[in-house]
Amino acid sequence: MTALNSYAFAMSEYAEGDSSLLQLQEVDSSRMGGHVLSPTFNSSSPSLPVESHPICIPSPYTDLGHDFTTLPFYSPSLLGYGTSPLSDCPSVRQSLSPTLFWPPHSHVSSLALHQQQTRLQPNHPTGGTWAELTPHDHGEEENCKPLSKRVAVAEETSTSLRGKADMHYCAVCSDYASGYHYGVWSCEGCKAFFKRSIQGHNDYICPATNQCTIDKNRRKSCQACRLRKCYEVGMMKCGLRRDRSSYQQRGAQQNRLTRFSGRMRTSGPRSQEIKTVQRPLSGNKVVTMALSPEELIARIMDAEPPEIYLMKDVKKPFTEANVMMSLTNLADKELVHMISWAKKIPGFVEIGLFDQVHLLECCWLEVLMLGLMWRSVNHPGKLVFSPDLSLSRDEGSCVQGFAEIFDMLLAATSRFRELKLQREEYACLKAMILLNSNMCLSSAEGGEELQSRSKLLCLLDSVTDALVWAISKTGLSFQQRSTRLAHLLMLLSHIRHVSNKGMDHLHSMKMKKMVPLYDLLLEMLDAHIMHGSRLSHSGPQADPVPKESNCVQETFTCTSQHGGTLRP
């Protein structure tokens, strides 16, 4: 390629036009061989005088070892020189355009062509002519595109539009939302702020009038108003994204039951004995179908946990702090034994894992309150929380807001005393509270959920039959047995109402940091609040407790006025 080392540039003019042609280098045709191509023009174009020697641009890639060719260069439009517009005649416009001569081999020379006024459009992918693109042929260009390319462009446009439509803004500060956090769309800043607030100290004070504007630029100016707005827009501690809630809840339930099972290892060989007996029968029927009501009651009574002692003296006079500390300490101890008790109920371990944990989370305070009433049934005017801790109404009133709950507990205990509750009846009622606690929240969708729910209903029917059998052993007539069963079931509704009151009180004490909460008690409290919030948002028919509790209160009033005439 020594013949390419010297470049001679000269300008000449066409005889029949004003355009200029840039001649680059005169190259010996014998040195170029088959790579030099003579220029050709469209048949419809007038012939133009051309030099007898080929004029070409030497390829800079010859030294790379590939068989590249040179590119003939004739059109003045490629060099950025102005030409007269010939848009009126497409054939003339095409004839004056340059022709791209493709080499006989598969390699194509790479040459970047930059222009300011004109663009080049390849009409044919395999060796057609290059035509100048003017605004008049833009529509023709779009029509000439393959259908696949036009569909791809349309999809990209629709995707970008959908991206803008799916864009969410933070409900607190109106910044761009990074996701669905704590129940609302929020940005990373507000999500982190709310997380810090619910996990640590949140006693913020507004320096103004508690009406500060919270937006993207002023969200850090007032923490109190920012936290207030977080609650106003619906942020909550247990808020979950709708499409992720099922998966995350199942994972959380699995972790909780794993921890519960770890606590169960301390229950001794009795758990293993129960497990060996509780083998499922055909279909969804569990082992309780093979047990008679008497045997089932005996098994449930054997599962009763031992008595729990506080093991320390509470200083008198009682104060709100030491009373609440003692009660929460006892509750945490009882929760550990409650898990063991539930596992020992025949058929309980045969239902689904999710339902097992859900049942315990929904009913734990009701079970504790029923046990409290059973211990206090022979101590009028007092509540026996443990053998070494009992409180009268005056002693319990030292806790703010506890007097109403205390009175409701005493009233229910008095009603059990009037009914002369038997131990067998108490054991069945306690098991029924456990098995009936999440009926309004259960949403069976898959095959495993349906099978678990079927087993749960079968177990509940068996316990109900056992309660009917226990009532029949009292020697009452059929009418009296039916009335007694109705009164006992109405008391379960009253216990649930008292439990909801107690849960709200315990939660308020937690928020005020008035009492230390133990790990298991705190976990069960948070889980119950989460289920309660789901229940309150599920519709007006989800919570019939207030109406039922009013009926129970009227029953209590009637009983007290007529000297216990409702006793069967």
Curated annotation (Swiss-Prot):
GO terms for cellular component: nucleus. It holds the Pfam family Hormone_recep. GO terms for molecular function: hormone binding; nuclear estrogen receptor activity; sequence-specific DNA binding; steroid binding; zinc ion binding. Transmembrane segments: none annotated. GO terms for biological process: cellular response to estradiol stimulus; estrogen receptor signaling pathway. It comes from the Eukaryota. Residues 12-169 are annotated as: Modulating. Keywords: DNA-binding, Lipid-binding, Metal-binding, Nucleus, Receptor, Steroid-binding, Transcription, Transcription regulation, Zinc, Zinc-finger. Residues 170-235 bind DNA. It is found in: Nucleus. Residues 292-528 form the NR LBD domain. A zinc finger (NR C4-type) spans 170-190, 206-230. Composed of three domains: a modulating N-terminal domain, a DNA-binding domain and a C-terminal ligand-binding domain. Binds estrogens with an affinity similar to that of ER-alpha, and activates expression of reporter genes containing estrogen response elements (ERE) in an estrogen-dependent manner. Belongs to the nuclear hormone receptor family. NR3 subfamily. Binds DNA as a homodimer. Can form a heterodimer with ER-alpha. This is Estrogen receptor beta-1.
